[in-house]
């Protein structure tokens, strides 16, 4: 089975699918191994569409998804309305290889800086879109930074973030900003 965020699983799945399908829709990390696989698929005339996170410059038909950098800038603008210079922020994203989340993170930090907030006040956690890693990172940030004011979830592990807040007794004390309209995320809206 494919476990998202695991490049080896992604490459294996692409090899398997290439023999059985007429086209592939792919959401994967931008790394040399995936680029090489896309090149081989293109040589075989296998149509590939990337979605949610692009692999810029790769041989694919098109990208379908948000402008992640712009989405991050919008998130930064929203966050800046609730923050003052010096307020501590936690930014959680998959990792720098996942272009969609990196774009969100870069746009977020860029917009905060434009609004007068320092990047030094933003702690960054790469959690590979993994529930347990996100839970551990948010729990650690809450324990180490009692003045943490804001968490920007540029990834989809929002339930892990909320579990960490609940466990630390900080629900309602720390603002959380997230993307995506998933059933899990909607349960936390009030």
Where in this protein do the model-derived segments appear?
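Short, intrinsically disordered, charge-balanced linker/junction segments flanking boundaries
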Residues: 1, 18, 187-190
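Hinge/beta->alpha junction and helix N-cap segments in small-molecule ligand-binding domains
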Residues: 2-9, 30, 53, 64-74, ...
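Alpha-helix termination/capping residues and helix-transition junctions
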Residues: 18-20, 83, 145
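Flexible loop/hinge segments that line or gate small-molecule binding clefts
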Residues: 33-70, 182-190
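A conserved helix-loop-strand patch within extracytoplasmic ligand-binding domains
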Residues: 71-89
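Short, structured loop/turn "capping" segments at alpha-beta junctions
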Residues: 84-89, 115-122, 146-149, 172
């Amino acid at each position: 089975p494919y476990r998202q965020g695991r490049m080896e699983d992604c490459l294996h799945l692409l090899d398997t699918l290439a023999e059985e399908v007429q086209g592939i829709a792919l959401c994967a990390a931008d790394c040399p191994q995936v680029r090489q696989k896309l090149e081989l698929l293109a040589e075989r005339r296998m149509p590939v569409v990337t979605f949610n996170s692009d692999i810029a410059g790769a041989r694919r038909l098109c990208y379908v998804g948000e402008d992640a950098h712009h989405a991050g800038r919008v998130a930064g603008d929203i966050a800046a309305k609730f923050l003052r210079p010096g307020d501590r922020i936690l930014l959680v994203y998959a990792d720098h290889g996942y272009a969609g989340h990196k774009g969100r993170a870069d746009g977020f930090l860029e917009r905060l800086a434009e609004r007068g907030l320092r990047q030094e006040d933003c702690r960054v956690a790469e959690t590979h879109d993994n529930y347990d890693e996100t839970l551990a990172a948010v729990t650690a940030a809450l324990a180490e930074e009692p003045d943490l004011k804001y968490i920007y979830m540029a990834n989809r592990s929002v339930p892990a973030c909320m579990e960490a807040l609940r466990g630390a007794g900080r629900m309602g004390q720390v603002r959380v900003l997230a993307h995506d309209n998933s059933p899990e995320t909607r349960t936390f809206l009030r």
